[in-house]
Amino acid sequence: MGDKTKVQVSKLKPGRYIIIDGEPCRIVNITVSSPGKHGSAKARIEAVGIFDGKVRSIVKPTSAEVDVPIIDKRVGQVIAITPDTVQIMDMETYELYDVPIETGVEDEVKDQLKEGITVEYWETLGRIQIKKVRGE
């Protein structure tokens, strides 16, 4: 999909998503501090990357706007598994996607993958990650 939108920093909450350094991240913690009598409040946002798991943090004024990814949560079926990729087919559009196992599959899901099972995957900013295995 690759879509993103702008949201004011004061509207963000833990558990929501934000784009930091071009990487979609899940917000873990937000700390707001007012610097003094004439300064504007600043928010320190700590987040974990969806695809790489790295912790990132930014400091922004609460009145600033930041990019928020639009995450498309979809269901697909595993068609084929190679040593470094998983091929999935979307259950609604029947499009095929090649997902790299290293970055595109959650660690808990890697050992459960087999051909023919149904999975939930997230698509955002042109990247795909398999999040969980659905009941068969």
Swiss-Prot record:
The modification Hypusine is found at residue 37. InterPro entries: IF5A-like, IF5A-like_N, NA-bd_OB-fold, Rib_uL2_dom2, Trans_elong_IF5A_hypusine_site, Transl_elong_IF5A_arc, Transl_elong_IF5A_C, Translation_prot_SH3-like_sf. The keyword Cytoplasm applies. GO terms for molecular function: ribosome binding; RNA binding; translation elongation factor activity; translation initiation factor activity. The keyword Thylakoid does not apply. Signal peptide: none annotated. Keywords: Cytoplasm, Hypusine, Initiation factor, Protein biosynthesis. CDD domains: S1_aIF5A. Pfam families: eIF-5a (PF01287), IF5A-like_N (PF21485). It is found in: Cytoplasm. GO terms for cellular component: cytoplasm. One of its GO terms (biological process) is positive regulation of translational termination. Functions by promoting the formation of the first peptide bond. Belongs to the eIF-5A family. This is Translation initiation factor 5A.
